[in-house]
Design a protein with these regions (language model features):
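GST-like domain detector, emphasizing the conserved glutathione-binding G-site
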Residues: 1-185, 282-286
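C-terminal anion-handling pockets and recognition modules
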Residues: 254-255
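Phosphate-coordinating loops and pocket residues in cytosolic domains that bind phosphorylated ligands
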Residues: 95, 249, 258-259
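Short, solvent-exposed turn/loop segments enriched in Gly/Ser/Thr/Pro and often Arg
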Residues: 82, 208, 260
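GST-like fold's C-terminal all-alpha helical module
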Residues: 2-5, 135-136, 146-251
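Acidic/histidine-enriched, glycine/proline-rich intrinsically disordered or flexible terminal extensions
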Residues: 22-24, 260-286
Length: 286
């Protein structure tokens, strides 16, 4: 009988500190800071602490879209949080986000300053602060929130479920991979049927719902996430692919997706303090 078939849960759980998964060294069953370190602060009113994972990309795409739309007050400093090194457990970061997850944002233009965590919360805050990328029509606004929170509730099955067992688990496990592959394909089908009738998630208007969903599901169908496009047969979701490609061509998406990125061939930018930082990073890969 194989290891994955023979496991019997003990009466009381205890942590296996070397369980073989990629992130074992930073996983722990308690919260709070592990070391003292003040957070960096730049010159702009918005201070972002993040990494270019799908959740991190949501916020940098939003900030770059705001700047492209002419909202100069959306200028920001973006500081890399190296989660592999445990930087999310520094005292400065935990002071902003007690949950120790990226992204976290501080708006220093308010008194007292506003501390934000959870990517969906940050998107809503920025949309309301600048009155942008959120529909004014009540019906469309409701649709925007429907899909924004659909993503918040659904993506853990894609990331923590499928992505973990397909890419990061210590060895391939048939049951969880099959279980979460099925759910991921179901979610893609939900999106595909919606986008067959709508240009964007909230109808005809590009919004924070699109910015929340694209980094996960857009990257997935474009082959940028988990190297799983063939396994999941993403070509079956033509409307999701159409939408994903359309958004990928937006300057705000092209710029936002590389901020706090330290891997890959499509541009890297460890920290962002001005528009020229992104310009230079993108120019280096042309």
């Amino acid at each position: 009988m194989s290891k994955q078939e023979s496991y019997t849960p003990p009466k009381i759980w205890s942590q296996d500190e070397d369980d073989g998964n990629k992130w074992a060294s930073i996983n722990r069953p308690v919260s709070g800071a592990t070391h003292e370190k003040e957070r960096a602060v730049g010159k702009h009113g918005l201070q972002l602490y993040s990494l270019a994972t799908p959740n991190g990309q949501k916020v940098t795409i939003m900030l770059e879209e705001l700047l492209a739309a002419g909202f100069q007050e959306a200028e920001y400093d973006a500081w890399l949080v190296n989660i592999g090194e445990g930087e999310q457990f520094s005292s400065g970061f935990v002071d902003v986000n007690p949950n120790s997850k990226i992204p976290a944002l501080v708006d220093t233009t308010t008194t007292p300053e506003t501390k934000l965590f959870e990517s969906g919360s940050i998107l809503v805050y920025l949309a309301e602060k600048f009155n942008a990328f959120i529909p004014n029509d009540s019906k469309a606004k409701t649709e925007c929130f429907n899909w924004l929170f659909w993503q918040v509730g659904s993506a853990p099955f894609l990331g923590g479920g499928f992505g973990h067992f397909y890419s990061y688990a210590p060895y391939p496990m048939e049951y969880p991979i099959n279980r979460f592959a099925m759910e991921t394909k179901r979610q893609l089908d939900v999106l595909d049927k919606h986008l067959a009738k709508n240009a964007f998630m909230a109808g005809n208007e590009y919004s924070i719902a699109d910015m929340a969903i694209w980094p996960w599901y857009g990257n997935l169908v474009l082959g940028n996430l988990y190297d799983a496009a063939t396994f999941l047969q993403v070509h079956e979701y033509a409307h999701v692919i159409r939408w994903a490609k359309q958004l990928a061509e937006r300057p705000g998406v092209k710029r936002g997706r590389i901020v706090n990125k330290t891997w890959g061939d499509e541009g890297q930018l460890e920290n962002r303090h001005s528009a020229s930082d992104i310009d230079n990073a993108l120019a280096s890969v042309k």
